[in-house]
UniProtKB/Swiss-Prot annotation:
Gene it is expressed from: rpsB
CDD domains according to UniProt: RPS2
Keywords noted in UniProt: Ribonucleoprotein, Ribosomal protein
Keyword set includes Nucleus: no
InterPro entries linked: Ribosomal_uS2 (IPR001865), Ribosomal_uS2_bac/mit/plastid (IPR005706), Ribosomal_uS2_CS (IPR018130), Ribosomal_uS2_flav_dom_sf (IPR023591)
Protein name: Small ribosomal subunit protein uS2
Similarity comment: family membership: Belongs to the universal ribosomal protein uS2 family.
Classification via Pfam families: Ribosomal_S2
Gene Ontology cellular-component terms listed: cytosolic small ribosomal subunit
GO molecular function: structural constituent of ribosome
Coiled coil: none
GO BP, one annotated term: translation
Key word Ribosomal protein present: yes
Length: 249
């Protein structure tokens, strides 16, 4: 078992098994539901444990090949956690609002990212100081607005290799765009959500802060382990290339 894998106990302690009220359920989630308690659906964690660990192993493999996973969680319960864990793992993220076309219209979005980077340079190289107060204020506001929307993807450099999504219904547009482009989706899917178009369905509570923290931190750990492996392989290869050179000398 890898260090980043999650156990049944971890999920229980985080409340990952508590679904939504039974009247809000999506019948497509039937196979993942254990039963109901006080009109709340209980998620069968016997499904969640292997599903989550499969997804973590997939993300680990991607990271070991230096690929990128885009973290997506824009609702209040997820945004801070998604941002923190994506930053810790050195991955792109969307924590504020998904802009339509963020993936499918990447070329146009890149122009906005370039504008953001240009404004950030201007704010640091003294350009803003040469402007009138009004012009400087307008550019500062534009920069802050762009940073809020695009700050998490400004260094992505191109389309991601996978999406990791908290609350697949809330992020339906992101998932649809990923599906159109053939980008795999890892999704936390609650009892009220539609699992269609999600490649790695992880049945679990998508509202509890502790549960969301568990998923996102485990994902970050898996990615960091993959990156560490890639670095160790690169170091070993570099040493192997140095050895013949040293013997020739």
């Amino acid at each position: 078992m890898a260090d980043y894998n999650v156990s049944m106990r971890d999920l229980l302690q985080a409340g990952a098994h508590f679904g939504h009220q039974t009247r809000f359920w999506n019948p497509k989630m039937r196979q993942y539901i254990f039963g109901a308690r006080n009109k709340i659906h209980i998620i069968n964690l016997e499904h969640t444990v292997p599903a989550l660990n499969d997804a973590l192993n997939f993300a680990n493999q991607l990271a070991s090949k230096k690929n990128k996973v885009l973290f997506v969680g824009t609702k209040r319960a997820a945004s801070n956690i998604i941002r923190e864990q994506a930053q810790r793992a050195g991955q792109p993220y969307v924590d504020h609002r998904w802009l339509g076309g963020m993936l499918t219209n990447w070329k146009t979005l890149r122009q906005s990212i370039n504008r953001l980077k240009d404004l950030q340079t201007q704010s640091q190289d003294g350009t803003f100081a040469k402007l009138t107060k009004r012009e400087a204020l307008e550019r500062t506001r534009e920069m802050e607005k762009l940073e809020r929307s695009l700050g998490g993807v400004k260094n992505m450099g191109g389309l991601p290799d996978a999406l990791f999504v908290i609350d697949v219904d809330h992020e339906a547009i992101a998932i649809k765009e990923a599906k159109n482009l053939g980008i795999p989706v890892i999704g936390i899917v609650d009892t009220n959500s539609n699992p269609d178009n999600v490649d790695y369905v992880i049945p679990g509570n998508d509202d509890a802060i502790r549960a969301v923290t568990l998923y996102a931190s485990a994902m970050a750990d898996a990615i960091l382990a993959g990156k560490e492996y890639a670095q160790s392989q690169a170091n070993a290869q570099a040493k192997g290339e140095e050895a013949p050179a040293a013997s020739e000398a």
